[in-house]
Amino acid sequence: MAIHLYKTSTPSTRNGTVYSQVKSNPRKNLIYGQHHCGKGRNVRGIITTRHRGGGHKRLYRKISFIRNEKYIYGRIITIEYDPNRNAYICLIHYGDGDKRYILHPRGAIIGDTLVSGTEVPIIIGNALPLTDMPLGTAIHNIEITLGKGGQLVRAAGAVAKLIAKEGKLATLKLPSGEVRLISKNCSATVGQVGNVGVNKKSLGRAGSKRWLGKRPVVRGVVMNPIDHPHGGGEGRAPIGRKKPTTPWGYPALGRRSRKINKYSDNFIVRRRSK
């Protein structure tokens, strides 16, 4: 999709950009409302995740991550914007009359035909088990547990690579740089997730950020000592510590936070790179 620039008529539009997409109304049987009461709060109303709140009301689009319609050909009808993710979605009309949303693969256009199953062609948008894919295939929407649906590589522009197959396991290189083992029977979709240039988009103003449900981020060094370990001092003062910390006093910027001896450590060949 192309990036469109606003005319520099006002300060709020001077630096803003917008992506063009196919405009169409979502299907009513594939959407439902969400109940957001106090974003970033727990049941007691206490903030558990900072910098969240507000935002425009959204309708959730039901996405089919499983792709369990075996050997039933489907055609892409629309490519739509989804406010709940940074990737686009496309509506698939299958031969049996079923209609579903899936993540939009990069390069797929309206009118393309997709299919899922074993030994299907290696074409962008087709879904098949890892055991039937050749080495070097670019994939996304990857299952971790057989039959549970895709859980890995679903963000806009994300793509993984199948680099090896040995025994019952396949080796994948994920977008983070992590090399991980997954069962060869798990399914994945061929190609890369669309909307690759979403990270080049400029919101242009603070109000656009608030529409997304993201609140302002205040630096700890400008707070009071009771609010943050970096706070306090006369005027513009340093943090007063050897290393920066979180608001709760834990080391920040680089400390590994992954749980020790996690069950999935056995499937990680190489940890992600920073």
From Swiss-Prot:
Entries under Gene3D superfamilies matching the protein: 2.30.30.30, Nucleic acid-binding proteins, Ribosomal protein L2, domain 3
Sorted UniProt keywords: Plastid, Ribonucleoprotein, Ribosomal protein
Location in or out of the cell: Plastid
Domain of life: Eukaryota
A single Gene Ontology CC term: mitochondrial large ribosomal subunit
Complex and partners: Part of the 50S ribosomal subunit.
Protein name according to UniProt: Large ribosomal subunit protein uL2cz/uL2cy
Underlying gene: rpl2-A
